[in-house]
Structures are given as structure tokens and as C-alpha cells.
């Protein structure tokens, strides 16, 4: 491709990347262009070129796609958060479905995966593996129960908060993200006013100076409880009682804490927590299970869709109350406790010690006694418990990080031979890879369904059910009725002639 930086060109967007950038092609050369939509014809400016692909900036939409809409957020193009705001929600769901389906077919080699348009049709019309319609939201806004806002200063030294521009640490000022709860705006303005009043400076990455680095806000959607955690570059927040007094007057405020992070790092939260108001956690529900959520807890950010996601996982697990279930990468026990009410025993495995403590506490507050949690890596705990202690599994549920399951973990699952494996995935490429591994070793995909947990972004969750292809215990023979009676007559004749 004979093009250099700042050259302009025209291209039609044919596809989108996992991070929501439009993909256009010129004579086999691939361009990635942010803020474009499938079907757009655009003018773009070259930013960077590689041997077979390059990056360009959108200059002008020459012919808009039928799927293009006006973004609601005023900083949509500058912010690194919502990559798909310029695409209609219906088309977003279609894009995510296609992405997962194509990965499963191309990477997972599931050529026989049938797409089903209506729920319920799969049982009678599609005897093999089925790909069910994506579970979307009626209103894909204000769905996030968690937000982390960086604090910094603009070129004039004024305190700003908002979100980072894509692939940078430049803060785009925005105190009201339309994906977050409305209380975020009031909380951020109160903290910003407090900092200005008492001359408390925001953190500066370059000089490792200043105090306030980030503010974490969480809300229990079912309980209405609010949590605020200030991440500080120090051990003391001057005049903190003034801030607490203001924050606690916000309706629902339940917990206020400080996270001490004095390291030169991009990691947001520190290891030391100082609780300055409330119990140090909030509570929320998924279904009828109550969860305690601390500042460090992993908890799904979209509660409405989480209930759909876990409900689907529970359905695919097919529990009758007699099964032994292993829940790998279990976090604070969200799926484990959801399953435990319908299983004989659930074992959860998690590498983060705080999450395991939270999981055990969540089991206690719900009175769930048939669950046990192990601290450690899934690829170490599962082989140990199976090979040394002989613990079996009827169902295995996995919900790994984006990198997918470790091969040793998958190998142990195959050796254990559970009837069903329920795979919850946040990355369809690694899902497809791991599904291929299991299918090559005695399992078959039965159902796949996407859940739009992260509306207006390029990410999607997927639930996949695999069943064990065990040999039938009996031989099934289909015999025509006339053949049946002919055989019976011959048997009678043979018996009479003996």
C-alpha cells in the first residue's frame, strides 16, 4: 500500500473489529477506522501503516450506513468507552451475534451450528447444535452498577474527571456517563467541589504527585445502596470528615472508603482499604441470592443482563438436585450460589483470596451450606482434587477471563467426564478454541446463546452448553411393523418344527 501518514482515501466499511473499529479493504489491504459503522462509505486520513494493515481517522461520512444513528453522548467520539454508539442497537446485536457465530464456525470448526430465529424452535426443528437469538436489553442505557473515574488536571490546572480517550491516559471531562447511574454526577461534583475547597490536588502520573487518583462508585440496583471509594496516593485524606458529611447525605449512601495506592502503576486499586463510613460493602441480589460487594469484589456490572446470563447457565446445567457441580473461576460465588439451590454439592475455585472470602461470606448470609470454595488456580486445584482426592463432577461450569481456560484445566475436565460442561465466556475467540479442544475429546456442542452485557461496546458474553458423547448403554434398533410380525411368524414356525 503506497500511502503515508496524513494521506486521505475513500473506503466502504465491511466489518468491525472486536474493539468496535470499522474495517475497510483496499486491494486486500485492511484499514481500521474508529467511529465508523458497517455500510458507511467514508473519507479517512492515514495515521499509521503496517505491512498488511493500517489505522486511519474518520474525516467525513460520505454515504451513511442505514445502521448509522446520532450518538446521544456529546463526547462519544473522543471517549474510549462506547465504541458502538453510532450504530443502531438492533444492528449492534446483529454484529455481536455474527462475531460469536463466525468465531465458533471458523475457529471452533462447528460447521453444523444451526442459527435459530425463535426460542423453543430448537427442540423440534434442529437436532444438532443450535445458536439461539442474542439476549438484548429494552433500554441499553444507565445499565452499569459500577464506574471508575480518573481525576486529573487540564492544561490550565483545573481539576477534571471523566474517562480516558481511547488508548491514552488523557482525561476527557465528563461527569455523567450515560451508561452509569444518575447518582454518579452528584457524587463526582461533590468530590470535585471538596477538592477545590480544600486545595487537594489530583494525581499527576508524570510527577507521581497529587493525592486523588480515581473514584470508584458502585450501586446495588435491587437495594439502592451506594458505595464510594477514593483511590489516593497516600494514607490520609485531609478534611475527610467534611467529605464524608457531604456524601452520606446522598440518598442510598451506605459505604465510603479509601484505597491506598502509592505505586507508580496503571493498576487502579491499591491493596490497603480504609473504611471511613459504613460497613465497607454494599449488598445486592441476583435472583433471590443476596451478595455482599466490597470495593475489590468482582461483580457483573449489568445486573439486569446478569440475571438472564446466569438463568441461562442454570438452565443449561440441567440440575435436578442430585448433581455435583464444579464452578471454575467463580469470583465471589455469583454463579456458584445461583446453582447451589438446585444441586447436591457445588465446589467453587477462585485465585483471588478476597473474592474467596467474599464467596464464603455470601454463602453464609444466604444460609447455603452445600457449597465449598477453594483458593487457587483452576488448573492446579481441579487436577489435585480429582487425581488425589477422587472428587467427581456431574456438571462443570467455567467462567474464565478473556484468555480462556488453561489446557491443563480442560484436560482434567475431559478426564472427569462430566455429563455437561457450561462455558460462560467474555471472549468468543478463546471460547471457540476451548470448545474445539473439548469437542476433539468426546464432547459436543448442544446450545450457544449470546447475552449483551456491555451494550454500546464491542464486548459480548456467551453461554455454551456441551454434552458428553458417551457410547449408548443399549443398541437402538428401528424395525418396521411388517418386518416385526414376519420375524415373529418365522420364530413360531421354527419353534413348531423343532
Show which residues each predicted segment covers.
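Terminal RNA-binding accessory module
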Residues: 1-75, 119, 124, 372-373, ...
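Rossmann-like S-adenosyl-L-methionine
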Residues: 2-7, 18, 239-498
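Short, acidic/hydrophobic/Gly-rich beta-strand patch recurrent on exposed beta strands
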Residues: 22-27, 162-165, 229-231, 359
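Short, conserved phosphate/pyrophosphate- and ester-handling motifs at nucleotide-, phospho-/glycolipid
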Residues: 39, 180, 302
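Extended interfacial segments that mediate partner engagement and assembly in macromolecular machines
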Residues: 59-71, 77-202
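Short, solvent-exposed loop/turn elements at beta->coil junctions and helix N-caps
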Residues: 132-140, 205-206, 214, 218, ...
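Internal alpha/beta scaffold segment
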Residues: 170-213, 234-260
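Short, aliphatic-rich beta-strand segments
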Residues: 217, 224-233, 290-294, 395
Amino acid at each position: 500500500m503506497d500511502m503515508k501518514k496524513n494521506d486521505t482515501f475513500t473506503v466502504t466499511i465491511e466489518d468491525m473489529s472486536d474493539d468496535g473499529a470499522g474495517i475497510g479493504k483496499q486491494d486486500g489491504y485492511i484499514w481500521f477506522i474508529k467511529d465508523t459503522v458497517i455500510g458507511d462509505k467514508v473519507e479517512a486520513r492515514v495515521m499509521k501503516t503496517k505491512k498488511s494493515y493500517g489505522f486511519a481517522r474518520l474525516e467525513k461520512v460520505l454515504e451513511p450506513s442505514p445502521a448509522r444513528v446520532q450518538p446521544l453522548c456529546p463526547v462519544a467520539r473522543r471517549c474510549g468507552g462506547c465504541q458502538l454508539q453510532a450504530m443502531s442497537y438492533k444492528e449492534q446485536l446483529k454484529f455481536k451475534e455474527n462475531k460469536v457465530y463466525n468465531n465458533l464456525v471458523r475457529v471452533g470448526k462447528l460447521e453444523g451450528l444451526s442459527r435459530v430465529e425463535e426460542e423453543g424452535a430448537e427442540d423440534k426443528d434442529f437436532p444438532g447444535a443450535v445458536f439461539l437469538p442474542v439476549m438484548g436489553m429494552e433500554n441499553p442505557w444507565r445499565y452499569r452498577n459500577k464506574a471508575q473515574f480518573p481525576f486529573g488536571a487540564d492544561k490550565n490546572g483545573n481539576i477534571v474527571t471523566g474517562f480516558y480517550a481511547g488508548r491514552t491516559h488523557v482525561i476527557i471531562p465528563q461527569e455523567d456517563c450515560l451508561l452509569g447511574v444518575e447518582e454518579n454526577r452528584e457524587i463526582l461534583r461533590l468530590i470535585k467541589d471538596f477538592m477545590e475547597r480544600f486545595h487537594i490536588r489530583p494525581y499527576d502520573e508524570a510527577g507521581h504527585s497529587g493525592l486523588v487518583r480515581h473514584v470508584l462508585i458502585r450501586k446495588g440496583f435491587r437495594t439502592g445502596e451506594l458505595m464510594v471509594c477514593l483511590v489516593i496516593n497516600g494514607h490520609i485524606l485531609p478534611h475527610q470528615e467534611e467529605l464524608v458529611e457531604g456524601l452520606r447525605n446522598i440518598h442510598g449512601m451506605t459505604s465510603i472508603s479509601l484505597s491506598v495506592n502509592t505505586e507508580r502503576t496503571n493498576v487502579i486499586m491499591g491493596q490497603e482499604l480504609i473504611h471511613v463510613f459504613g460497613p465497607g460493602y454494599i449488598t445486592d441480589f441476583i435472583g433471590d441470592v443476596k451478595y455482599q460487594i466490597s470495593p475489590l469484589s468482582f461483580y457483573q456490572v449489568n445486573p439486569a443482563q446478569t440475571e438472564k446470563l446466569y438463568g441461562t447457565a442454570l438452565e443449561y446445567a440441567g440440575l435436578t438436585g442430585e448433581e455435583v457441580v464444579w464452578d471454575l473461576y467463580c469470583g465471589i460465588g455469583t454463579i456458584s450460589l445461583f446453582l447451589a439451590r438446585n444441586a447436591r454439592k457445588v465446589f467453587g475455585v477462585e485465585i483471588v483470596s478476597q473474592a474467596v472470602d467474599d464467596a464464603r461470606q455470601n454463602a453464609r448470609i444466604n444460609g447455603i451450606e452445600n457449597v465449598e470454595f477453594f483458593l487457587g488456580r483452576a488448573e492446579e486445584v481441579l487436577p489435585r482434587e480429582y487425581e488425589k482426592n477422587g472428587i467427581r463432577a456431574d456438571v462443570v461450569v467455567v467462567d474464565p477471563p478473556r484468555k480462556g481456560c488453561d489446557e491443563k484445566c480442560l484436560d482434567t475436565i475431559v478426564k472427569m467426564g462430566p455429563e455437561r460442561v457450561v462455558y460462560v465466556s467474555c471472549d468468543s475467540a478463546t471460547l471457540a478454541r476451548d470448545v474445539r479442544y473439548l469437542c476433539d475429546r468426546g464432547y459436543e456442542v448442544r446450545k450457544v446463546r449470546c447475552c449483551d452485557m456491555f451494550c454500546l461496546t464491542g464486548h459480548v458474553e456467551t453461554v455454551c452448553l456441551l454434552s458428553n458423547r458417551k457410547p449408548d448403554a443399549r443398541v437402538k434398533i428401528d424395525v418396521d411393523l411388517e418386518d416385526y410380525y414376519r420375524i415373529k411368524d418365522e420364530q413360531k414356525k421354527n419353534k413348531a418344527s423343532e
